[in-house]
Amino acid sequence: MLKPISALNDNYIWVYGRENCPVIVVDITEIEPLLPFLRENKFAVEAVLLTHKHDDHVGGVAAFKRYFPDVPVYGPQECADKGATRIVNEGEIVTANYRIRVIPTGGHTAQHVSYVTDGCLFCGDTLFSAGCGRVFTGNYGQMYDSVQRLKTLPDDTLVCPAHEYTLANLAFAESVMKDKSAVKNQRVLVEKKRAENRPSVPTTLGLEKQINPFLIAENPAQFETWRKAKDQF
């Protein structure tokens, strides 16, 4: 089970679980949409994963901990004062039912991390469908390296970003990429999904390698140029 729960204006709280197992929750934006979903489906929670410190990713953690005080909350050092109880940077988290790879993906924030388990990539604000995150407390070189790190994952990896930015990202991608065919095809599909109020994600890493300019950028300089252009797009 892999479920993006809409929160705030365009955030997704991700819930993932193997059959008959407690679930993992990624980036608790707010408690309100998450709690009813967990209760209606009678899901226990095995772990919470935080990608970075921004309020739209951790704003519901304190409330969650009031309902689930014994659930471990994993996150980078920058989340220590945001509710993280177990600090991670890279390596592996092993719980009763899951093995979760932790990948350092700084750039959007300096200590941002991403998580991979069972072929699902929870990449927060590092990688979006057809885009990548803005650079705030990290730097462009760091963000480029992070995206390159994610690019090495298998093509069938499910990309699970934290925002519904896909249509805007596709518009930018079409403006800068030489081969626009895959971008145009994906835009048609995403427009239909969004018209039906369905999420555009997850996608696959293989697809992202065709439609995401930040995975296609040939060098750090081109990456930085495109990222700065996207900021003004």
Curated annotation (Swiss-Prot):
One of its GO terms (molecular function) is metal ion binding. CDD domains: hydroxyacylglutathione_hydrolase_MBL-fold (cd07723). Keywords: Hydrolase, Metal-binding, Zinc. It comes from Actinobacillus succinogenes (strain ATCC 55618 / DSM 22257 / CCUG 43843 / 130Z). SUPFAM superfamilies: Metallo-hydrolase/oxidoreductase (SSF56281). One of its GO terms (biological process) is methylglyoxal catabolic process to D-lactate via S-lactoyl-glutathione. InterPro entries: Clx_II_MBL, Glyoxalase_II_hydrolase, HAGH_C, Hydroxyacylglutathione_Hdrlase, Metallo-B-lactamas, RibonucZ/Hydroxyglut_hydro. Its EC number is 3.1.2.6. PANTHER family: HYDROXYACYLGLUTATHIONE HYDROLASE, HYDROXYACYLGLUTATHIONE HYDROLASE GLOB. It comes from the Bacteria. Zn(2+) 2 binds at D56, H57, D125, H163. The lineage of its organism: Bacteria, Pseudomonadati, Pseudomonadota, Gammaproteobacteria, Pasteurellales. It catalyses: an S-(2-hydroxyacyl)glutathione + H2O = a 2-hydroxy carboxylate + glutathione + H(+). It is an enzyme of class 3 (hydrolase). Pfam families: HAGH_C, Lactamase_B. HAMAP family: Glyoxalase_2 (MF_01374). Pathway: Secondary metabolite metabolism; methylglyoxal degradation; (R)-lactate from methylglyoxal: step 2/2. Zn(2+) 1 binds at H52, H54, H108, D125. This is Hydroxyacylglutathione hydrolase. Belongs to the metallo-beta-lactamase superfamily. Glyoxalase II family. Thiolesterase that catalyzes the hydrolysis of S-D-lactoyl-glutathione to form glutathione and D-lactic acid. Binds 2 Zn(2+) ions per subunit. Its cofactor is Zn(2+). Monomer. The keyword Cell membrane does not apply.
